[in-house]
């Protein structure tokens, strides 16, 4: 090869290398620009698909820095899109219940500023559980606590804290309410808050911290709701509300709410005669509630809510071991699945149960006449067989020498199944303990377990003689 050919060859190779390097730099620059500005295109549908017209909530936005040959590329990670809950997983199979939480509010009130409350409940968002209660507008060691046995005053508010955190002075007052229900649809909290005159109360519907809708009393006789969590499926939440006599015929309606707006109201239908203070749980694709018949029955009413067509059916828990208080002795109590048993129906107490195939898990006071003690058990055939009384897996939650109160259910979604949990209200003060002038409560919480468990009793534990009068 002569010198001229060598020069031409070397020049050609150099030009080729330079061209390749130039193209690589252009590619790197294009990649950088594309990654930086393409965040909004993540998971975009094909051009012939219709995008839903609804807001997308961004939980977090993370920037990753990747180093390529001394060139820095800032890569925007696609944000998570928050979805509505649908509760489509199966119910967890359990052997019983294990302790989960206890707030010790009354014991702490002996030496600290803790709210006077009643009607507590628990509900969870997708990541965390919260405890709620209706405050009396006062702490316990305060003269305003005198007379807090009364249910409905304009100073009552719905309190909300992380589960296990007592209602201290820094507790958030979510709304004005002497009756309430709360639930999280996967995107935000819905609070149903009832307050006002007995003959003309108002229910406010607060979603994501904003008042969205309201409804007034329809029977002018103490509009009221569940005192435990409502349930949301695919963005629609349902809550049971009653207006009318507490010991006679009343008007119960089931409301359907979408992001705080009432979208439908269904009347109660089926064989249930009286409905109060329902404890509801998701049973995909529908919702099921176990309630309190304060008129005719010590067996608990059941409401089945169809979330698609808004239809309602009702009946009674089949178990002959009935769940309300007061009630007959177990040997003489009855239930035929369809009708109230006409056994000591009035007054009653809020409670819960849930189906497990043909069986039923349930909780109730140990004392058949008053709100003392608390027990749970499963009744074989208790969901499908009239007057079934075969009891297994009994547990004592609160021994019969200590006071209990209301109880209710809440559901927690796990990786593979939906667990059922319950809380027990531990009432202290009046009317049973007349040394003091106040009425308040603490709570204890248990959740279903597939493991083994021991025994115990978890009462409130406060010495009434140590408490402010």
UniProtKB/Swiss-Prot annotation:
The chain crosses the membrane at residues 7-29. Its EC number is 3.2.1.18. Its cofactor is Ca(2+). Glycans are attached at residues 61, 69-70, 86, 146, 200, 234, 402. Keywords: Calcium, Disulfide bond, Glycoprotein, Glycosidase, Host cell membrane, Host membrane, Hydrolase, Membrane, Metal-binding, Signal-anchor, Transmembrane, Transmembrane helix, Virion. Residues 325-349 are annotated as: Disordered. It is a single-pass type II membrane protein. The active site is at residues 151, 406. It catalyses: Hydrolysis of alpha-(2->3)-, alpha-(2->6)-, alpha-(2->8)- glycosidic linkages of terminal sialic acid residues in oligosaccharides, glycoproteins, glycolipids, colominic acid and synthetic substrates. The keyword Hydrolase applies. Residues 91-469 are annotated as: Head of neuraminidase. Residues 30-469 are virion surface. GO terms for biological process: carbohydrate metabolic process; viral budding from plasma membrane. SUPFAM superfamilies: Sialidases. One of its GO terms (molecular function) is metal ion binding. Disulfide bonds join 92-417, 124-129, 183-230, 232-237, 278-291, 280-289, 318-337, 421-447. Homotetramer. The influenza A genome consist of 8 RNA segments. Genetic variation of hemagglutinin and/or neuraminidase genes results in the emergence of new influenza strains. The mechanism of variation can be the result of point mutations or the result of genetic reassortment between segments of two different strains. Intact N-terminus is essential for virion morphogenesis. Possesses two apical sorting signals, one in the ectodomain, which is likely to be a glycan, and the other in the transmembrane domain. The transmembrane domain also plays a role in lipid raft association. Catalyzes the removal of terminal sialic acid residues from viral and cellular glycoconjugates. Cleaves off the terminal sialic acids on the glycosylated HA during virus budding to facilitate virus release. Additionally helps virus spread through the circulation by further removing sialic acids from the cell surface. These cleavages prevent self-aggregation and ensure the efficient spread of the progeny virus from cell to cell. Otherwise, infection would be limited to one round of replication. This is Neuraminidase. It comes from Influenza A virus (strain A/Singapore/1/1957 H2N2).
């Amino acid at each position: 090869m002569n010198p001229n050919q060598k020069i031409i060859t070397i020049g050609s190779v150099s030009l080729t290398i330079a061209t390749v390097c130039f193209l690589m730099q252009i590619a790197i620059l294009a990649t950088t620009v594309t990654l930086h500005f393409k965040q909004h295109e993540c998971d975009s549908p094909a051009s012939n698909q219709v995008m839903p017209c609804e807001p997308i909530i961004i939980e977090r936005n993370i920037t990753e820095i990747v180093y390529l040959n001394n060139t820095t590329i800032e890569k925007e990670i696609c944000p998570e899109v928050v979805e509505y809950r649908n509760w489509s997983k199966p119910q967890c199979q359990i052997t019983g219940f294990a302790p989960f939480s206890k707030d010790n509010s009354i014991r702490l009130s002996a030496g600290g500023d803790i709210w006077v409350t009643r009607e507590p409940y628990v509900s969870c968002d997708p990541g965390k559980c919260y405890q709620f209660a209706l405050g009396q507008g006062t702490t316990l060691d305060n003269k305003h606590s005198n007379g807090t046995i009364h249910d409905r005053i304009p100073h009552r508010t719905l309190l909300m804290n992380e589960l296990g955190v007592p209602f201290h002075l820094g507790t958030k007052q979510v709304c004005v309410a002497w009756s309430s229900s709360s639930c999280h649809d996967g995107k935000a909290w819905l609070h149903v808050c009832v307050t006002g005159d007995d003959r003309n109360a108002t229910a406010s519907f607060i979603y994501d911290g904003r008042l969205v809708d309201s409804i007034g009393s329809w029977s002018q006789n103490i509009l009221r709701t569940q005192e435990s969590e409502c349930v949301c499926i695919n963005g629609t939440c349902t809550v049971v509300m009653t207006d009318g006599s507490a010991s006679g015929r009343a008007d119960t309606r089931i409301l359907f709410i979408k992001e705080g707006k009432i979208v439908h109201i269904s009347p109660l239908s089926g064989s249930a005669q009286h409905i109060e203070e329902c404890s509801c749980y998701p049973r995909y694709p529908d919702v099921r509630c176990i309630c309190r018949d304060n008129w005719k029955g010590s067996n608990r009413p059941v409401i089945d809510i169809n979330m698609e067509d808004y239809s309602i059916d009702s009946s009674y828990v089949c178990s002959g071991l009935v769940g309300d208080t007061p009630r007959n002795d177990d040997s003489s109590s009855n239930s035929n699945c369809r009708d109230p048993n006409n056994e000591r129906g009035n007054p009653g107490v809020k409670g819960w149960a849930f189906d497990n195939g043909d069986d039923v898990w349930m909780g109730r006071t140990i004392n058949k006449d008053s709100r003392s003690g608390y027990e749970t058990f499963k009744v074989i055939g208790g969901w499908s067989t009239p007057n079934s009384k075969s009891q297994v897996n009994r547990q004592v939650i609160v021994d019969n020498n200590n006071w209990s109160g209301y109880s209710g259910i809440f559901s927690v979604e796990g990786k593979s199944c939906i667990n059922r949990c319950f809380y027990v209200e531990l009432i202290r003060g009046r009317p049973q303990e007349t040394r003091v002038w106040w009425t308040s409560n603490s709570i204890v919480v248990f959740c279903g377990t597939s493991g083994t468990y021991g025994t115990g009793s978890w009462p409130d534990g406060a010495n009434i003689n140590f408490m402010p009068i």
